[in-house]
Amino acid sequence: MMYIIYITITEAHMLYLADDKKTNYVIVYRKDHTDSEKTAAEELATYLEKITGANFPVVTDDASAEKHEIVVGFCDRPGCKAQKKLGDDGYTIKVSGERLLILGSAVRGALYGVYTFLEKYCGCRFFTKDFEKVPTVERTLYVDSNIDLTEIPVFEYRNVYWYSFMNDEMICAKQKINGGMGHPITDKIGGGVHYNGGFCHTIPELAETGNIWDMPCLMDEDIYQTTLKNVRAKLRAEPDKKIISISQVDGNNGECSCDKCRAVFEEEGSHIGTLIRFINRIKEDIRDEFPDVVLDTLAYQYTRKPPEKTKPHDGMIVRLCNVESCFRHPIENVCHEVDPAFGSFPENLRKWSKICKRLYIWDYTTNFTNMSTIFPNLMALRPNMKLYADTGVVGVFSQGNSTDFNGELGELRAYLLAKLQWNPYMGEAEYRLHMQEFCENYYGEGGKYILRYIDMIHDCSEDSHMNMYFDNSANIISMKGYKDHLTGCFAFYDKASELFDKAEAETWGAKNKSAYTNVRRSRISLHNYYNFVLKSAKENFENEEDKLMIERAIVENNREHFILMRECDVKENREFHRLDFSEVPDFTTYPMQW
């Protein structure tokens, strides 16, 4: 669980950290510090100077103690002894006399505590790797002596796999992302959770089959011995990486169908039976040499259903993938057809949680077929993350558009996911506040219209369902109260266009120069939507003159769509496909075909 503890002290007073660009405070951290502790102290000094204009000296704890200190991390000061309960990532922020204490581990806790202090008590916001808000005080920065906050994360592993957090370790620290996949997390920010070798679909390499689409027979002794040999080799080559994935091939029809494998499938009631037994055996065989290594696998598509007899080894992570779910609504609603052979995702989740000590979730948070189309899943993210926490999940990997800017609301989605991964129990009001703060800063004066647009896309898709692979958003979003779906689509487009027009007008020439571009970039998804509305209209019209008019509208919309993508540097319109802006596409075709 996450524990957030507030302790009220009766007679409060203020700690005046800076006044008129001067300070009496020094920042203190451990002499025998880690890189992360040093980063924490230096980052605090840097941001406090930006906020107040005052220079905060930074010293180690072998210096003489002073009355006015900001203590960062566990060190040689009263009340600053290490607390095991905080783990690697937890922290306590409190006041003791005239001292401000930001206490946390030498791994990441002290650093995370610093960024939380800057957010909660100084008004900083870390929205993306390129955009943050750092307020300035005209004269005095003070904090209430009643401060006493402890936070310990629910999830030991947190990874938001979106472009706005990629390839920048500092935004990872600011958003408390510790998953190393896609993020260059070094000792500077306390390191992270890194996998040894591949992150997923690793069995073809480990078993040396050379076949990425077909699963090898896991009852074959040669396959086992080859895999065991390669697991040992990888662990010896990179002994600092303590997790290695032994996971199935991608796709939905890769399992072996030999008699031995089929017998295990029937005995276990699941196709993951052979895989769990295979990995359990490897764990036992490497236990003496690598006692602290954790083996990892996927429960994905045909292996999603848990086995009925064999439990995963205590030293195993199972990453359960919610690939088949409807993402418009909370996953627990189960608003799609369920194959009785595999069961529903919530059912699988609860059963896995009973037999697996370290259960992770692979969470899909974009439309991989059309990454710049409207994807109204923002209202489902919070209940989904709470479901994972309630069910005992200890790690979440939220996969999105990781390779490029998102022509929709990807930057907002990534920010919200990071907040939820740290605190999956936040209430609706807090969640809405995070959304509002992001929009009002990232989109500037246009943010109020983007917020109305967000509400509208969710209202207009309330009765629809969507998976992670769909190309036609016009099938999902339509304004209610019109004679037919298509008429409602045109009405939605007109209203949404009006909101974006106002947002652009409010941000053109604004001091926040990036706001206009951010509004324009998010508008790409509306152009994408309109393309499918026009396509549907063309299919419904019988009159050739009307069809010709629609064809001209399609060409004009596609031309504007392409210009906007080039202007905002959005190259990837679907997974594994990037546009070449030096070549002008055929505007009579759909963007998915460019």
Show which residues each predicted segment covers.
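Disordered inhibitory propeptide/activation segment of secreted metzincin zinc metalloprotease zymogens
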Residues: E11-N24
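Feature activates predominantly on carbohydrate-active enzymes
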Residues: T23-N24, V28, D32, S36-E43, ...
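Short, well-ordered secondary-structure micro-motifs within conserved domains or adaptor modules
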Residues: P57-K84
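Structured mid-domain segments that build the active-site/substrate or prosthetic-cofactor binding neighborhood
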Residues: L218-Q225, A233, E337-E445
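Active-site-proximal loop/turn and secondary-structure-junction residues that shape catalytic pockets
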Residues: D250-N252, A299-T303, N322-E324, T365-N367, ...
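Acidic, His- and aromatic-enriched active-site or binding-groove loops in soluble protein domains
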Residues: F265-I279, H313-E332, L420-Y425
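Substrate-binding cleft/loops of secretory-pathway carbohydrate-active enzymes
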Residues: A299-F327, T373-M379, G407-R413
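Catalytic domains of carbohydrate-active enzymes that cleave complex glycans
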Residues: L420-W594
